[in-house]
């Protein structure tokens, strides 16, 4: 099915197979045109509209195929603006904002002025192939847009894009192969989304109702099982604040081996519950001279400056900056830190709402210390943490599989869309 190409020619866009052509987009498309936005102040242009109206967020929120839009316009709105009907199976291309975002519309649509509708010529250029060519070069188009005065692309620039043009049948085969990979990625994404919904439901049920309870009582944090108690964080955890050693002193940072965790490190975990490394590390000298709080593994780190509420459990002893607080348990016999990490993640919105500050939100040490939390029996804490951790592991495995497929797709795109590897037709 595949073979390695041996015969290449040099072109403006690099080496391509001898039997491929280089063409400008305008020469292989029937139409390349931006849309327009009907006046939002005119109700008749939008009320009970039936024409899907594409904005950039519709493209960024879709995968390869666009099948729906958030907003719809009326015929009157269409006729009183620069919007036009883009036939289905055309290519939509963003010129502003998220430059280079691309989709194929599976329904007839109108677009706003930030989006080009591109209709390829029949029997010359396949929409599916064009989609992948544009997607492959997205970063280049984005940089190109940033070089213009307006920091955007325009229709004239896009019309002059030079693209490789393999024989039509080969275009179809290339698109078919890449579509199969995209379908695999989409299946995994759906599975991840399903698991995340399951986890959300489990967190709500387990962290408020526990496991196997039939008797409940009212409390300051809502209805909880009868044998659960309510305490403030300071009753169960020692709360420590973080700091930043002087960045002007290299002895505090150079060849540092001690984790120095920031809210950014926590935000990069996504849904993971554990953290074992940080982007920047400090030295033992910094630890001694700057009175940094070093807290043991198994402790909780929570971001308390914008963004508030990112939480993780340490897998190694670490220190942290002033955007975080460290919580380590006072009594190991009654606390499972994984349970409380999940509980604090579950209460992220409430913690954000408690945060004060006009410039940026911050959860003070006293606010966190006084925050009320439940205390279930230790074995139940462990069971709840184990269930949620198991779902997290499943999600993480799916994400790793998705990332592997995405890496594979990128390599295959590079080989097929440059003609280094050919598809037999």
From Swiss-Prot:
Region (Distal conserved region (DCR)): 369-418
Chain spans, region Target recognition domain 2: 209-368
Subunit structure, as described in the record: The type I restriction/modification system is composed of three polypeptides R, M and S.
UniProt domain comment: Contains two target DNA recognition domains (TDR), each specifying recognition of one of the two defined components of the target sequence. The TDRs show high structural similarity and each forms a globular structure. The two TDRs are separated by 2 long, conserved antiparallel helices that form a coiled coil structure. These conserved regions may act as a molecular ruler for the separation between the two recognized DNA sequences.
CDD domains in UniProt: RMtype1_S_EcoJA69PI-TRD1-CR1_like (cd17273), RMtype1_S_MjaORF132P-TRD1-CR1_like (cd17275)
Presence of the UniProt keyword Protein biosynthesis in the record: no
Note: Type I restriction and modification enzymes are complex, multifunctional systems which require ATP, S-adenosyl methionine and Mg(2+) as cofactors and, in addition to their endonucleolytic and methylase activities, are potent DNA-dependent ATPases.
Location of the region described as Target recognition domain 1 in the Swiss-Prot/TrEMBL record: 9-168
The keyword Coiled coil is annotated on this UniProt entry: yes
Name the UniProt record assigns to this protein: Type I restriction enzyme MjaVII specificity subunit
Gene3D superfamilies reported in the protein's UniProt record: Bipartite methylase S protein, DNA methylase specificity domains
Biological process per Gene Ontology, one example term: DNA restriction-modification system
GO molecular function, one term: DNA binding
Parts forming coiled coils: 169-208, 369-418
Keywords: Coiled coil, DNA-binding, Restriction system
Family: Belongs to the type-I restriction system S methylase family.
Protein task: The specificity (S) subunit of a type I restriction enzyme; this subunit dictates DNA sequence specificity. In the presence of the R subunit the complex can also act as an endonuclease, binding to the same target sequence but cutting the DNA some distance from this site. Whether the DNA is cut or modified depends on the methylation state of the target sequence. When the target site is unmodified, the DNA is cut.
Region (Central conserved region (CCR)): 169-208
Domain of life (superkingdom): Archaea
InterPro entries (UniProt xref): Restrct_endonuc_typeI_TRD, Restrct_endonuc_typeI_TRD_sf, Type-I_RS_S_subunit
């Amino acid at each position: 099915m595949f073979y390695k190409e041996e015969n290449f020619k040099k072109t403006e866009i690099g080496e391509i197979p001898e039997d491929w052509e280089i063409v400008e987009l305008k020469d292989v498309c029937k139409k390349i045109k931006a849309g327009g936005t009907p006046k939002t102040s005119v109700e008749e242009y939008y009320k009970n509209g039936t024409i899907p109206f594409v904005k950039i967020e519709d493209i960024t929120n879709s995968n390869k195929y666009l099948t729906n839009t958030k907003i719809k316009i009326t015929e009157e709105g269409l006729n009183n603006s620069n919007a036009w009907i883009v036939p289905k199976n055309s290519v939509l291309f963003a010129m502003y904002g998220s430059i280079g975002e691309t989709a194929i519309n599976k329904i007839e649509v109108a677009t706003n002025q930030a989006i080009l509708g591109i209709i390829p010529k029949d029997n010359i250029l396949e929409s599916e192939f064009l989609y992948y060519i544009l997607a492959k070069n997205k970063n280049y188009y984005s940089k190109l847009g940033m070089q213009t005065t307006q920091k955007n692309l325009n229709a004239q620039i896009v019309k002059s894009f030079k693209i490789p043009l393999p024989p039509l049948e080969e275009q179809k085969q290339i698109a078919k192969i890449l579509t199969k990979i995209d379908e695999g990625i989409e299946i995994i994404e759906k599975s991840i989304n399903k698991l995340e919904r399951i986890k959300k439901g489990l967190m709500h049920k387990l962290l408020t109702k526990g496991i196997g309870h039939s008797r409940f009582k009212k409390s300051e944090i809502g209805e909880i099982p009868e044998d659960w108690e309510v305490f403030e964080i300071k009753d169960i955890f020692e709360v420590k604040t973080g700091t930043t050693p002087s960045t002007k002193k290299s002895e505090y940072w150079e060849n540092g081996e001690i984790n120095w965790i920031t809210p950014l490190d926590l935000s990069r975990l996504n849904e993971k519950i554990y953290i074992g490394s940080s982007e920047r590390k400090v030295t033992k000298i910094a630890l001694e001279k700057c009175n940094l709080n070093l807290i043991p593994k198994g402790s909780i780190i929570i971001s308390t400056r914008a963004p508030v509420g990112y939480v993780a459990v340490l897998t190694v002893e670490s220190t942290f900056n002033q955007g975080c607080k460290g919580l380590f348990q006072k009594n190991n016999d009654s606390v499972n830190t994984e349970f409380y990490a999940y509980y604090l993640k579950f209460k992220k919105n409430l913690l954000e709402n408690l945060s004060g500050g006009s410039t940026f939100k911050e959860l003070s040490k006293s606010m966190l210390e006084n925050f009320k939390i439940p205390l279930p029996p230790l074995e139940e804490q462990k069971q709840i943490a184990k269930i949620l951790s198991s779902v997290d592991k499943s999600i993480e495995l799916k994400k790793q599989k998705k990332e592997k497929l995405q890496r594979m797709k990128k390599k295959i795109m590079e080989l097929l869309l440059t003609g280094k590897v050919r598809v037999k037709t």
